[in-house]
From Swiss-Prot:
Function: Bifunctional serine/threonine kinase and phosphorylase involved in the regulation of the phosphoenolpyruvate synthase (PEPS) by catalyzing its phosphorylation/dephosphorylation.
Any Pfam family hit: Kinase-PPPase
Positions that bind ADP: 152-159
Ranges in a coiled coil: none
Protein's recorded name: Putative phosphoenolpyruvate synthase regulatory protein
Entry keyword annotation includes Iron: no
PANTHER family per record: PYRUVATE, PHOSPHATE DIKINASE REGULATORY PROTEIN 1, CHLOROPLASTIC
UniProtKB keywords: Kinase, Nucleotide-binding, Serine/threonine-protein kinase, Transferase
Length: 272
């Protein structure tokens, strides 16, 4: 079964898309064609949006699902004339919250993502720069400033996880790829030993690792199943021997991996 889903906002669309994606993910038996439409901030754009929604309804022969975070009442009323099932995120959550807090919300566009009013902005940038500068074991002499150091075989998800933690939570995360030489020594590399308390391991199913590496270096020893299986087995053995907490990243999203890492290591988010 297929349905169209629209994430519509008069701002960036981040809130509508994030919440909408989370809700739609609960319906695994349905395939959704997803469309993000940010900055629908005028009557003309709203009318054009209605036409897009109606076209999707005609094509699918079923009304689309619409997640919106539109602040302007006139624009919301225009969207409501479309042949779609609307979920107005702001009105759904703000109305009961206003009642509980005995206060009216500001209904401001892009409030949570404003750079000018976000005291965490520079800290976020610094964390991202740290993750980039300390990616792939590039600069181990800065590990004393890291909150977390992810370790694991090449292409198991270390870099995207570090960047996500930096962007979302201001975590200074470094990562170090364990190589075949490290495995042959049967011990942690010298650069990691003095930061053992910051280490967290990522592992991955060999067949998934093979597929990922094949996209980068097809038909190579690096991407062969035998090599991937060997590296994963040896690294998992190293994690157990050195008592390093670790998880298998195969079936988890970057968001889930990040949350598990922070909980396991007891690291507090710099901002929430």
């Amino acid at each position: 079964m297929k349905r169209s889903a629209f994430f519509i906002s008069d701002g960036t669309g981040i809130t509508a898309e994030t919440l909408g994606q989370s809700l739609l993910a609960q319906f695994e038996n349905i395939t959704f064609n997803k469309f993000t439409r940010p900055y629908i901030d005028s009557v003309e754009k709203a009318r054009a949006m209605v036409q897009q929604i109606n076209n999707a309804a005609d094509k699918d022969d079923v009304r689309p699902i619409i997640f919106d975070t539109i602040v302007n009442q006139d624009i919301r009323e225009i969207l409501a004339t479309s042949n779609g099932f609307m979920i107005d995120i702001f009105s759904t959550f703000l109305a009961p919250l206003e009642q509980e807090l005995s206060s009216h919300s500001s209904y401001s566009v892009g409030k949570s993502h404003s750079i000018g009013h976000n005291s965490n902005y520079m800290e976020r940038i610094e964390a991202v720069n740290f993750a980039l500068d300390n990616d792939d074991g590039a600069r181990t002499h800065y590990y004393d400033k890291a909150d977390i150091i992810l370790v694991g075989v090449s292409r198991c998800g270390k870099t995207p996880t570090c960047l996500y933690m930096a962007m979302q939570f201001g975590i200074r995360a470094a990562n170090y790829p364990l190589t075949e030489d490290d495995m042959e020594r049967l011990q942690l590399p010298a650069a990691l030993k003095q930061h053992r308390e910051k280490l967290f391991g990522l592992t991955i199913d060999p067949d998934r690792l093979t597929a990922i590496r094949h996209e980068r270096k097809p038909n190579s020893r690096y991407s062969s199943y035998a090599q991937c299986e060997f590296e994963v087995r040896e690294v998992e053995s190293l994690f157990r021997r050195e008592n390093i907490a670790h998880i298998n990243s195969t079936h988890f999203s970057v968001e889930e991996i990040s949350a598990k890492v922070l909980v396991e290591k007891g690291v507090e988010r710099r901002f929430k």
